[in-house]
């Protein structure tokens, strides 16, 4: 249930209004007409490009961890019928997923050069995917000596190869095809300011473009962002980020807190829905408290933390009644019914602040479908 607040700049006003000598009123009306509503990415394609490489690597690592958790959770449930739906991955695998996904992306972008789309989609790309994943898995096992909890799969058999082939088809035909439609604005703020008319005409243009102000403008007068990813995609992002948070936390807690030489962290399939829904609501709180009320970071964070604890307790209580709760803090001090503990308060504070940063970034990302 992550949350981060960084003062960031919203989109800059468009410079579509041209100056007419001696026609201040005409300039005002022309500027207002040119900036009626926030532009979508489809309406302003020149201002947006592909996601930066660092952002794609971040997404790829998070997406890879999600697949690890889904596969290991399904395997474990098939063996034990455990309703906790525990899944496993590790920071090492996150790094490998980032690198292998990035390499596969470069191969995917060469698809137009292949004379046969069928050959590329069902043979060439899946073969590269299976080969890279197998090589990465073998390298991880050799470096760590194998991992507990199913983080590192055994040697590939026929069923494993079939699963990897299906994942390769999903990766090429579903994930990358849509992920590469995401767009991010290029930084033109400084260039735009340098080319705006000076004095009163520039002020008029800034006022006319004020409807597009987003994070970073005057507090209390800003509009809540209306751009960004659709709500469903935001929910999916927050759910996957919840997996990332828990895998990293449990991994480092096992290694540092207990002195255990663990090579994996764990989470639960239910955490996807718990984190996704909680972060989705916290983001709405951020937009309301920051843009409508003008509240600063440390005035908002206590509200976030109270909501997070209430959300964790409610989910834990419901899952415990079904025998599906994957955590128990009864052995920790400052716990309540073993479902929440103040020991994790520093972590929730950090994640609460971090989510505002994530929200500011997601507000700039646009999904632009291609024909």
Swiss-Prot record:
Intrachain S-S bonds: none
Record localization: Membrane
Annotated region (Disordered), positions in chain: 1-30
Keyword Membrane applies: yes
Highest taxon in the source lineage: Eukaryota
GO cellular component terms attached to this protein's record: membrane
Record field: transmembrane: 51-71, 117-137, 235-255, 269-289, 301-321, 334-354
Principal localisation: membrane
Keywords linked to the UniProt accession: Membrane, Transmembrane, Transmembrane helix
Keyword flag Membrane: yes
Membrane topology: Multi-pass membrane protein
Family recorded in the similarity comment: Belongs to the TMEM229 family.
Annotated PANTHER family: TRANSMEMBRANE PROTEIN 229 FAMILY MEMBER, TRANSMEMBRANE PROTEIN 229A
Protein's UniProt name: Transmembrane protein 229A
Provenance organism: Mus musculus
């Amino acid at each position: 249930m992550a949350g981060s607040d960084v003062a960031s700049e919203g989109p800059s006003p468009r410079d579509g209004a041209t100056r007419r000598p001696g026609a201040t009123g005409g300039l005002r009306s022309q500027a207002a007409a040119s900036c009626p509503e926030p532009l979508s990415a489809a309406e302003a394609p020149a201002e947006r490009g592909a996601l930066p490489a660092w952002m794609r690597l971040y997404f790829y690592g998070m997406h890879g961890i999600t697949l690890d958790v889904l596969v290991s959770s399904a395997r474990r449930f098939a063996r034990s019928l455990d309703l906790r739906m525990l899944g496993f991955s590790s920071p090492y695998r996150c790094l490998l997923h980032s690198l292998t996904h990035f390499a596969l992306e470069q191969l995917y972008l060469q698809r137009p050069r292949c004379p046969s789309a069928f050959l590329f989609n069902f043979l060439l790309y899946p073969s590269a995917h299976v080969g890279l994943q197998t090589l990465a898995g073998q390298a991880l096992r050799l470096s760590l000596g194998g991992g507990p909890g199913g983080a590192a799969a055994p040697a590939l058999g026929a069923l494993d190869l079939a699963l990897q082939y299906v994942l390769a088809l999903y990766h090429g035909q579903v994930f990358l095809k849509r992920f590469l439609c995401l767009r991010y604005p290029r930084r033109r703020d400084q260039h735009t300011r340098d080319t705006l008319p000076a004095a009163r005409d520039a002020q008029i243009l800034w006022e006319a473009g004020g409807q597009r102000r987003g994070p970073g403008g005057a507090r209390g007068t800003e509009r809540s962002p209306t751009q960004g990813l659709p709500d469903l995609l935001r929910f999916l992002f927050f759910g996957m980020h919840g997996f990332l948070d828990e895998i990293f936390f449990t991994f480092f807690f096992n290694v540092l807190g207990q002195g255990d030489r663990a090579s994996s962290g764990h989470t639960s399939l239910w955490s996807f829905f718990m984190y996704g829904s909680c972060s989705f609501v916290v983001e709405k709180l951020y937009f309301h408290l920051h843009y409508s009320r003008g509240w600063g970071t440390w005035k908002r964070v206590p509200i976030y933390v109270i909501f997070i604890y209430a959300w964790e307790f409610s989910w834990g209580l419901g899952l415990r009644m079904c025998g599906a709760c994957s955590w128990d803090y009864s052995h920790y001090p400052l716990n309540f019914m073993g479902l929440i503990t103040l020991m994790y308060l520093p972590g929730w504070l950090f994640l609460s602040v971090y989510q505002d940063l994530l929200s500011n970034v997601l507000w700039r990302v646009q999904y632009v479908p291609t024909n």
